[in-house]
Amino acid sequence: MTSRTEAVKAYLLDLQDRICSALETEDGGARFVEDAWVRDAGGGGRTRVIGEGKVIEKGGVNFSHVFGAGLPPSASAHRPELAGRGFEALGVSLVIHPHNPHVPTSHANVRFFIAEKEGEEAVWWFGGGFDLTPYYGNEEDCVHWHRVAEQACAPFGADVYPRYKAWCDRYFHLKHRGEPRGIGGLFFDDLNEWDFDTCFAFMRAIGDAYVDAYLPIIQRRKDTPYTAKQREFQEYRRGRYVEFNLVYDRGTLFGLQSGGRTESILMSLPPQVRWGYDWKAEPGSEEARLTDYFLQDRDWLAQ
């Protein structure tokens, strides 16, 4: 493990600790349970899960550090020149599914890849981002989420937030449904356009911004009363989350194709989900407004 990899690993372990501590404090009931694991083909990680809390119905914050002799297809499909290289991958990935339908689901991920081949220069890159999936949209929350994202990107250039915001909108899109998974945020991958230290600093800025983006939303919405009907709608919309993660998500595909730990990879799935055949929201309802207004390509900072 190189000094660069060691520095990234130290940051990611600390990030996992800080995020878990902040979420435990905010929940005020449940605590994370840690499950350390070892990957037979090389590496391992520590999965931390939380459930049935006062606020969080199910959540997970996973650290992994895996390596192998060859990149799996999900990682080399768009970079065929990397096929056959040994790899090392480190990351923190998290998903939080709250009880209350008025509190959005959140997802964040930061990661580092390095692909090596004897006699050739190592190829490295960073990736990550965070995105928000509301069930009952609130404009204040959407603007706050994107404002924090913009502020995290600002030191790295005025074009960074709009570029990675647009990438997030494209990435978290369910092609078979013709709709986005949520209201977006940031997404970046294959980041090595700056020097290593700048790229690493950017990854840290995104990782550190997650708590600032999400906790104020929890605090504003966690005590909002909700009905059984609203809970059913939340479970229906969670189905879209499952569909995206199992069909499109590159992290899920990479984990499964590289022989990762299935329980840790699938920790992102919500605990209660429903599908209704050809279900449609009543026109003009709160449920219809989610797709008609919130799940649209929108510049939230121009509101």
Curated annotation (Swiss-Prot):
It catalyses: coproporphyrinogen III + O2 + 2 H(+) = protoporphyrinogen IX + 2 CO2 + 2 H2O. PROSITE patterns: COPROGEN_OXIDASE. Its cofactor is a divalent metal cation. One of its GO terms (molecular function) is coproporphyrinogen oxidase activity. It is found in: Cytoplasm. It is an enzyme of class 1 (oxidoreductase). Pathway: Porphyrin-containing compound metabolism; protoporphyrin-IX biosynthesis; protoporphyrinogen-IX from coproporphyrinogen-III (O2 route): step 1/1. InterPro entries: Coprogen_oxidase_aer (IPR001260), Coprogen_oxidase_aer_sf (IPR036406), Coprogen_oxidase_CS (IPR018375). The active site is at 107 (proton donor). Pfam families: Coprogen_oxidas (PF01218). Its EC number is 1.3.3.3. Keywords: Cytoplasm, Heme biosynthesis, Metal-binding, Oxidoreductase, Porphyrin biosynthesis. Residues 241-276 are annotated as: Important for dimerization. GO terms for biological process: protoporphyrinogen IX biosynthetic process. One of its GO terms (cellular component) is cytoplasm. A divalent metal cation binds at residues 97, 107, 146, 176. Homodimer. Involved in the heme biosynthesis. Catalyzes the aerobic oxidative decarboxylation of propionate groups of rings A and B of coproporphyrinogen-III to yield the vinyl groups in protoporphyrinogen-IX. Belongs to the aerobic coproporphyrinogen-III oxidase family. HAMAP family: Coprogen_oxidas. This is Oxygen-dependent coproporphyrinogen-III oxidase. It comes from Pseudomonas entomophila (strain L48). The gene is hemF.
